[in-house]
Amino acid sequence: MARPMDEDETIVKLQGRSQILYRRDHIKADGRSVSLYGFSSPSGLAGLELVGLGNHRSELRRDPLRNTWAIYSPHRQSRTFMPARTADPLAPWRAGSAPTEIPFSEFELAIFDNQFSSLQTGDAGSVPSQWASGPATGHCEVVVYTSESEGDLQSIGQERRVLLIEALIDR
């Protein structure tokens, strides 16, 4: 069900390095954020959105043989892997389609909080371990630079690459 823009959304006009751009910030039902960027002011209602799995625990562990640190994130085993074209979580939402991470039917560029991040935000607390370990804290986002299901950075054109750089600078 689509819902109108509400208190969970804002549209910000930004002065980019090359031109004016807009950012639409949307808070999803699970608390994660989605930011849409474009050279024109974004419009449209939010549609169905994927809801995150909730809390997860990741930890840093030190490998005593290699003297290196590694991130262990068991919850990532349930992440989406090679979905069917009709269940693409990075596709724009369409009426009658499955929920997606981007609950808007039109966008130029989208950045959202990673549902399957190896890192966790906030105070993760300590994880009991007999080895040297600690919380794996940080923030991970997913960048979707086109609403098309085909293409790459070369095929999107220079204007879209400029928008991508402007959005990354804003982040």
Where are these regions (language model features)?
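Active-site microenvironments that recognize anionic phosphate/pyrophosphate groups
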Residues: 2-171
